[in-house]
Curated annotation (Swiss-Prot):
The keyword Membrane appears for this protein: no
Organism: Bacillus mycoides (strain KBAB4)
Molecular function terms, GO-annotated: GTP binding; GTPase activity; magnesium ion binding
Protein name, UniProt field: GTPase Obg
Signal peptide start and end residues: none
Keyword DNA damage assigned: no
Entry binding sites for GTP: 165-172, 190-194, 212-215, 282-285, 310-312
């Protein structure tokens, strides 16, 4: 089964907790703090595996959670960093943040890697907090939570040339005679429901990869007939071969087919019209094909070169392949996304709002504090130790949260909530 789009959940490993410990060794007076730092949590790393051709495996496993770092130990020993969680994906996979739509990675080459969810740093042990005024601190940090997100994986096949056209115009037959690919061929519409790839040899030491894409119908750009799933695979191609049925046996008019398919390409992605397009008049071995071709040429004009062929008899196929190979030599790869879009995506990754916090009030009068920085600080605080609690209170004041609460009318004894935890506000 060919699967080209899935949604999954990924989470980097939490950092290991720092430790509160002291040196208690014979002949070592005033040993001091000796709590080690926690180890870094593992990253979730996507790696391209050349042998994969589909996202099928992700239908059975949709949650990927990396291991947390090892906790700090006594005698100043730091916790071990966890091994990264490696997730293998096929070449041509695009990873998007489900919430923001941000493009996190475009993975195309073998063994290319991308960190999709970063592990948290390890919490600091009490030896890190020693000062001249507090030489034996009773404080350590919990590990930083690992990054977590829902992501969408989209697979867009890697091919130099894409065959497009209405169903049953002979795309699969053409691919089968010019390559060793063996797509399913039958006398009914939508025989091809997944992309088929074949390596084409032109006979003069040139070769390219051709994709037989499922047939398009009117309205495909808006999703009709699974149009989105089919059209996304055209985006990586450099040359489009537009196959048109000249036999008239299906009752369609060749020129109308030509206009309709090009309109669908334009409506789906304007940049598809920038690609060179080779128009192929197929089924020229049929009785009325020559007459239909002349009528098609009259409507189309002289600006478009047409290659009459018969995929069944191989008439005209050699000239077609040479033309495609020539176009590929002069056509650069088309970037999947504009530079502006990439720049915006990199800015989104900074999460500019994370340094802020928000205070809301529930119907029972409880003040609710939310925001990336305060929630991370809260999770990294060990509330079982008084010194850690006092440090957290200082951090809240440093962020301006105490002042903001007073401005909203908070007084002694009011309930303040962060995540699922509640405590009293003390002015």
């Amino acid at each position: 089964m060919f699967v080209d789009q899935v949604k999954i959940y990924v989470k980097g490993g939490d950092g290991g907790n720092g430790m509160v410990a002291y040196r208690r060794e014979k002949y070592v007076p005033k040993g001091g703090p000796a709590g080690g730092d926690g180890g870094k949590g593992a990253d979730v790393v996507f790696v391209v595996e050349e042998g994969l051709r589909t996202l099928m495996d992700f239908r059975y496993q949709r949650h990927f959670k990396a291991d947390r770092g090892q906790h700090g130990m006594s005698k100043g020993q730091h916790g071990r960093k966890s091994e990264d969680l490696i997730v293998k994906v096929p070449p041509g996979t695009i990873v998007k943040d489900e919430k923001t739509g941000e493009i996190l990675a475009d993975l195309v080459t073998h063994e290319q890697t991308a960190v999709i969810a970063r592990g948290g740093r390890g919490g600091r042990g009490n030896s890190r907090f020693a000062t001249a005024t507090n030489p034996a601190p009773e404080i350590a940090e919990n590990g930083e939570p690992g990054q977590e997100r829902d992501v969408t994986l989209e697979l867009k096949v890697l091919a130099d040339v894409g065959l497009v056209g209405f169903p049953s115009v002979g795309k699969s037959t053409l691919l089968s005679v010019v390559s060793s690919a063996r797509p399913k061929i039958a006398e009914y519409h939508f025989t091809t429901i997944v992309p088929n790839l074949g390596v084409v040899e032109t006979g003069d030491n040139r070769s390219f990869v051709m994709a037989d894409l499922p047939g398009l119908i009117e309205g495909a750009h808006s999703g009709v007939g699974l149009g989105h799933q089919f059209l996304r695979h055209i985006e990586r191609t450099r040359v489009i071969v537009h196959v048109i049925d000249m036999s008239g046996l299906e009752g369609r008019e060749p020129y109308e087919d030509y206009v309709t398919i090009n309109n669908e390409l334009k409506e789906y992605n304007m940049r598809l019209t920038e690609r060179p397009q080779v128009v192929v008049a197929n089924k020229m071995d049929m009785p009325d094909a020559e007459e239909n071709l002349q009528a098609f040429k009259e409507k189309l004009g002289d600006e478009v070169k047409i290659f009459p062929i018969s995929a069944v008899t191989k008439q005209g196929v050699r000239d077609l392949l040479f033309e495609v190979a020539n176009l590929l030599e002069t056509t650069p790869e088309f970037p999947m996304y504009d530079d502006v879009e990439e720049s915006e995506a990199s800015v989104m990754y900074k999460f500019e709002s994370e340094s802020n916090f928000e205070i809301t009030r529930e119907s029972d009068g409880t003040f609710v504090i939310s925001g990336y920085d305060i929630e991370k600080t809260f999770k990294m605080t060990d509330f079982s130790r008084d010194e850690s609690v006092r440090r957290f209170a200082r951090q809240m004041r440093g962020m301006g949260i105490d002042e903001a609460l007073r401005a909203r009318g908070a007084t002694d004894g009011d309930i303040v909530k962060i995540l699922e935890y509640q405590f009293e506000f003390i002015d």
